[in-house]
Amino acid sequence: MRKNALLLALLAAGPLFGPYTVAAQTPTADQAPLTLTQITQMAFQVSPTLTAAQQSVVQAQARVGQAQAQRRFQITFNSTASLSGANVYQPPPTYETFGTLQNTLTVPLPLGKRPRLAITQAQELRGAVSAQLDSARLALAGQAAAAYYDVLRKQALLAVAQQTLIENQRALSDVQKRNGAGDAAQLDVLQAQVPVAAAQAALGGAENDLAIANETLNSLLGRPLDSSLLLADIAPNALALPYTLSQAKQFVLERSPDLRSAEATIRADRAAVDAARLYREPAYFLQAIDIRSKDVTSFRSEDTLQAAVTLPLSDGGLGKAQVQEAEATLAGASAQAEVVRRTIISGVSAAYLTAQSRRRQVDSARTARDIAQVTYDKTTLGYRNGLFPLFQVLTARAALTQARIAYTQAVYDAAAASTTLSTAFAGSMPTPAPAPAVPAPAPLAGTIGTSPAGTGPSRASSGGRGGP
């Protein structure tokens, strides 16, 4: 039993005697904590992915302008100068050399359905690209939120590790004093040294985890990887879900940019099919021709106004092949839209259930932490009164440490899950204000005061947070 208790003590954290707290770092006036909204806006400003998506929208708009230009009158001027030699039927002269200048104005007439279908196709593709830009924004917002909450989570866990080490060192010192006074055995001193060593190892891991999380967030913001950030912490309560699962599915189908992009692509491909089927549509031109010649046997100048019609008679099967290609593209776009629809439904369902589960986990973890605190307090009092051996105190402390870590994880997991659900809702889900943190009850006699990390995080910075 003592062996098991020693193994559990490797994760033990929490004080043995006397009140002790570590205050959270207070930001200075010129270092206002950055909120998630501010972090997201900063990511938007420097993201190359978002810049590329924005340029795609500009390109799509330019293609719309090109298609619309095909519906306007376009005038082409052509001038041809030539030098000719000819035998004359009725001399004199029997042979002559003369020059000719021909000026031609050609005006294609924007008649038929194909120019209008080209405009429709370009406009729908512009809508698809615009929806893809919205999707890129949401994806980037999701990445920013994940990195933001990961930094907060790692800061909170680092604070737990720091406080754990301090409290275990304090506990070891107290046991050593009791051993010197003859109130504790030497084995108790050895047992108290185990959680100190474990806490030192855990602190190194927590510092490394926070450094990696900071680098990830800084990379997303285009900042130096080792720069520090001061982040505004969250309330220790998950956000309420304002919709049922069925309502969530319906809402996301109406607002999803990925589905809007897929549907716009279908409409564009349908216009392309209609245009391809008009491969025999004639083309109309209007021409004004002015000819000036030095031919003495013919006219000196000639002005002509003519209308021309170009009608494809045979293209070797090119038109039919283009129709088949357009129809296959349309069928593929329709299938892809169904894939997107199913992915969206499954994604929002998973996000909704996860957010709901995370919220319940926060409540359960809070209850478990409170019970572990009471158990530890009573075990500590029993140890001080000689009723329990030290290994039972270490076991209770290990359970309390695990409960604190689980609660800290649950708080940030719930916040991240709510943000993920909001992203699945195309960022438009109404979000009720979080409930304020409930103050923790006063600590029992002989226990430490409850710090912010013990009741739920309230503020975080790159320099650390309050202890557990």
Give, region by region, the residue ranges found by the protein language model.
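Small/polar, glycine/serine/threonine/aspartate-rich low-complexity segments that form flexible
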Residues: 26-32, 76-114, 118, 230-245, ...
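Alpha-helical heptad-repeat coiled-coil segments that mediate oligomerization/polymerization in large
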Residues: 185, 344, 351, 386-389
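Acidic, glycine-rich loop-and-beta core segments that form the ion-binding/anion-interacting portion
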Residues: 239, 245-288
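Terminal intrinsically disordered/low-complexity segments used for targeting and assembly
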Residues: 1-45, 207-251, 420-468
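Short, charged, amphipathic alpha-helical segments
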Residues: 120-123, 186-195, 390-398
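A glycine-/polar-enriched beta->alpha junction
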Residues: 41-51, 58-74, 103-121, 130-138, ...
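Periplasmic alpha-helical coiled-coil/stalk elements that build and connect Gram-negative outer-membrane
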Residues: 2-8, 136-251, 351-354, 358, ...
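Short segments within alpha-helical structural elements
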Residues: 198-223, 367-427
